């Protein structure tokens, strides 16, 4: 990519991207429902309408078939997230974009260093967005970057959150340079210390990615050997997860044993490991996407263009994402440990499997057993 714009968060990089492509009132943009909220919420700031799409059952990524179903004459763009580091099906998505003349924004916040058929994510679409938030493998505490090959997108994105010196250096076109002194009203500048931290983390990024993938591939092998209620996350052929932001196995103990995932996670936590439920609930199950933004619009005059066109999803509208979310656990990513620690973690899984009757009895006593 020719251009890179450093900003103060991954959210700001996405807002800059949406503003950069000139997304506006009356436009629709197709989005994953299974993603972190910041992939989509900046769209409201552009007065456009996000249209949520279901996910693939095996990766959690946006489903190309559902993308096709949601395209209308108002559709301007697609934003995708490479969830938990697994690249989306770029061949199918790019073909859809080409056929319908749609712009593509990649949210790569989970996928530093990930590749699809040998090509880095973030370089397929019109814009790539990355987060350097505290939990990312490259971090500035809170920072982000937007990359693109399009000069106009770059200049518009810069003017959204930068002014004076940064914009004087970046914005060269006659169309936009007259706004360089003021920008368009926001301050998205990256903090110098955040930039210094992120640059330092890039120095050994490849090695840290290598270690994490080796460890998690080993964990997947061991989990699948157990043949228990846990299924290791898949990585498709020609895909490389890069930073592997989250290791999210699928859990089938609710169907097999009647034990809810949060109880199983607590049992593993009692064995000394950081295990939980992923926080990224499908967006269509959140209040903002179930008509809640009506309240937001009513006291924020800038949103009035959407007052009569609010979003009103409900449970069951995007069933694959609901299924995926309900069956996903969050395991440690084991970046800086030796194989012995991973072996102990696998032994903990095996121990719970061998003593599952105690867990089932606990659920029956506490009223959370599924018959």
Residue ranges and their predicted role:
Residues 19-108, 115:
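PLP-dependent aminotransferase-like
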Residues 1-10:
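Conserved N-terminal alpha-helix of the aminotransferase class I/II PLP-enzyme fold
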Residues 95-103, 145-165, 259, 263-273:
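Basic phosphate/pyrophosphate-binding loop/patch that engages nucleotide-derived ligands
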Residues 165-175, 218-229, 264-328, 358-370:
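Conserved PLP cofactor-binding pocket of PLP-dependent enzymes
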Residues 236-238, 244-256, 275-294, 326-340:
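Conserved PLP-binding active-site segment of the aspartate aminotransferase-like
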Residues 111-117, 124-246:
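Active-site region of PLP-dependent enzymes
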Residues 32, 319, 331-333:
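Short, proline-centered helix/strand-breaking motifs
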């Amino acid at each position: 990519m020719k251009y890179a714009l450093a900003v103060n968060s991954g959210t700001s990089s996405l807002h800059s991207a949406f503003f950069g492509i000139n997304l506006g009132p009356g436009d629709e943009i197709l989005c994953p429902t299974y993603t972190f909220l910041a992939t989509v919420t900046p769209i409201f700031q552009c007065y456009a309408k996000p249209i949520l799409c279901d996910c693939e059952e095996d990766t959690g990524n946006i489903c190309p078939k559902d993308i096709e179903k949601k395209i209308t004459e108002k559709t301007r763009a697609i934003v995708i997230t490479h969830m938990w580091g697994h690249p989306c099906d770029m061949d199918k998505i790019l073909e859809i974009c080409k056929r319908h003349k749609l712009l593509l924004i990649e949210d790569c916040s989970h996928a530093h260093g990930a590749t699809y058929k040998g090509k880095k994510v973030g370089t397929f679409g019109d814009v790539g967005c990355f987060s350097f938030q505290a939990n990312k493998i490259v971090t500035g505490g809170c920072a982000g970057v937007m990359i693109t090959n399009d000069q106009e997108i770059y200049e518009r994105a810069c003017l959204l959150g930068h002014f004076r010196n940064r914009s004087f250096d970046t914005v060269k076109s006659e169309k936009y340079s007259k706004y360089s002194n003021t920008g368009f009203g926001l301050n998205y500048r990256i903090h110098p210390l955040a930039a210094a931290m992120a640059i330092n983390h890039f120095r050994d990024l490849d090695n840290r990615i290598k270690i994490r993938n080796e460890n998690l591939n080993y964990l997947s092998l061991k989990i699948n050997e157990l043949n228990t209620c846990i299924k290791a996350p898949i990585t498709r052929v020609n895909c490389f997860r890069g930073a592997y932001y989250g290791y999210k196995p699928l859990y089938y103990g609710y169907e097999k044993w009647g034990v809810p995932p949060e109880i199983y996670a607590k049992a593993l936590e009692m064995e000394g490991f950081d295990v939980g439920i992923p926080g990224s609930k499908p967006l269509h199950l959140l209040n903002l996407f179930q008509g809640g933004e009506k309240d937001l619009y009513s006291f924020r005059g800038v949103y009035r263009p959407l007052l009569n066109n609010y979003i009103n999803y409900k449970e069951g509208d995007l069933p694959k994402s609901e299924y995926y979310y309900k069956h996903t656990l969050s395991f440690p990513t084991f970046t800086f440990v030796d194989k012995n620690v991973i072996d102990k973690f696998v032994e903990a899984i095996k121990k719970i499997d061998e003593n599952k009757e105690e867990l089932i009895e606990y659920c029956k006593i506490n009223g959370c057993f599924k018959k």
